[in-house]
Amino acid sequence: MMATERANRMKLDRVSEKRALVNNAILGLYDYGGTAVFNAVTEYNTETGGNYTPVTVMAPSVFREFMIWLASKIDYLRELMQDNGKMFHQDVTGKEVDRHTPMSRQKLFLHSAFEKYFRANCSNLFNPSYLPEFAAVESVAYWQNPQAPMDVQGTAKTIDSAGAVQTVTTALCEDVIGILFDDDFMGLSNISNWSAPEPYNARFGYQNTWYHSTYRSITDWSENSLLIRLA
């Protein structure tokens, strides 16, 4: 029982570190704006001449067509990310650099509700079995808070145009569908795990054991990444 509880707590620590890394990326991309963010409803309105909102686009009369369009658009954005270009990353110190990300190096973290919407409404377009070159589609039940599963709130560490680290404060990034990125864009490594027991407490008959983990993370803003929102 205690060993299981300890393992669960250590796993939760790792999950928390990963979630914090992804949320930092979401808030950073939201702050950069421009081509770092794809606002799906806005783009849908532009292409169709509609006047939908994140609420009205989910109405039964529109929902299926919008999901089919969105699945196709994400597929198109993945193709764009394969080509050398400057659209999906940040350039620093005044030097523009072309980047490309092959399908096999792309990852998509997708809100699980939308993964299920895609499968229900357009499985012939959005089906991992038809995407053998696509490295990973990972379903995420919530980004930060299960009570507001599509929202992220807080601060983020990014880089400015000179390449220096900066802290950005974003009150709230709402309606996050997913994040598409090069697998070099962000990563997390556990560089040290160790444990040691305290001396045995002879009076009360117990012994504490302390567990330590050290994580290091990286977010390379010069690599390709894209925030996808229902906005």
For the regions a language model picked out, list residue spans one by one:
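Extended, compositionally biased alpha-helical segments that mediate assembly or anchoring
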Residues: 117-231
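Alpha-helical scaffold segments that mediate packing/assembly in large oligomeric complexes
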Residues: 3-76
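Generic detector of intrinsically disordered, low-complexity, polar/charged segments
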Residues: 25, 30, 46-47, 82, ...
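Solvent-exposed, non-transmembrane amphipathic alpha-helical segments
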Residues: 15-18, 22-26, 30, 83-90, ...
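Long, charge-rich alpha-helical interaction segments
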Residues: 43-114, 118-122
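Hydrophobic transmembrane signal anchors and adjacent membrane-proximal interface regions, especially
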Residues: 12-13, 27, 36-41, 52-60, ...
